Amino acid sequence: MYKLVLIRHGESTWNLENRFTGWVDVDLTETGAAQARQAGKLLKEAGMGFDVAYTSVLKRAIRTLWHVQDEMDLMWIPVRNEWRLNERHYGALAGLNKSETAAKFGDEQVLVWRRSYDTPPPALEPTDPRASYDDPRYANVPRNEIPLTECLKDTVARVMPLWNESIAPDIQSGKRVVIAAHGNSIRALVKYLDQISDDDIVGLNIPNGTPLVYELDADLRPLRHYYLGDQEAIAASLAAVASQGKAR
């Protein structure tokens, strides 16, 4: 049996402000840093260890991983920073307040933009300063692969090559893998692992800073999965994530 641990980054500054974030590189709040440290403590208490870590190229996920590694005394393990694990690109919604956007366009439209499988938000213009074409962290990414907007289907399409070419082979070689990433890149992985339908994925939310443990068979099919931590607090966190895109 193999184990895989997925962790969404701790609360970010724009999570706190209820803004669409996507590829904008915001940092953790103090609460987010504490969530990440607690995740590391829970993993250590559960007797888990890791041989390799994957994260995105965005600091909220990177710093979350740092805190987890620090709590587990695993700062020395190899880390792969992969743009394919970035959050879904929210296009022209990046930086907008979710509740204000819902008040303007309606809860239903914002739910579609946030959670539908194949409907992307309005795209950025290529000349928009929020576009990532000139960002040095994407210097080796083909321009046509740098998005101006994404739906979850697009996110799945960029995450899966990394899974197939790197993450899955690492797991099957016996390496213990932890992935610190983002709500939608983790939803993409969970959709694949649990074979969730395009319709049902709309209802899946991922809480901040909470280790999600998968136990996998020899073919990397899930035997079971579970969150580490206080289950009531996790349920409250999931409910809070679900309500972010509603008008107030």
From Swiss-Prot:
Q: Which chain positions carry the site (Transition state stabilizer)?
A: H182
The UniProt entry annotates the active site at: H9, E87
State the pathway, as annotated in the record: Carbohydrate degradation; glycolysis; pyruvate from D-glyceraldehyde 3-phosphate: step 3/5
The reaction(s) this protein catalyses: (2R)-2-phosphoglycerate = (2R)-3-phosphoglycerate
Q: Provide ranges: composition bias, Basic and acidic residues.
A: 127-137
Q: Name one GO biological process term.
A: gluconeogenesis
- Cross-referenced Gene3D superfamilies, in alphabetical order? Phosphoglycerate mutase-like
Please give the family membership noted in the entry: Belongs to the phosphoglycerate mutase family. BPG-dependent PGAM subfamily.
Its assembly, as annotated, is: Homodimer.
Its annotated function is as follows: Catalyzes the interconversion of 2-phosphoglycerate and 3-phosphoglycerate.
Give the protein's recorded name. 2,3-bisphosphoglycerate-dependent phosphoglycerate mutase
Source organism per entry reads Cupriavidus taiwanensis (strain DSM 17343 / BCRC 17206 / CCUG 44338 / CIP 107171 / LMG 19424 / R1) (Ralstonia taiwanensis (strain LMG 19424))
Taxonomic classification: Bacteria, Pseudomonadati, Pseudomonadota, Betaproteobacteria, Burkholderiales
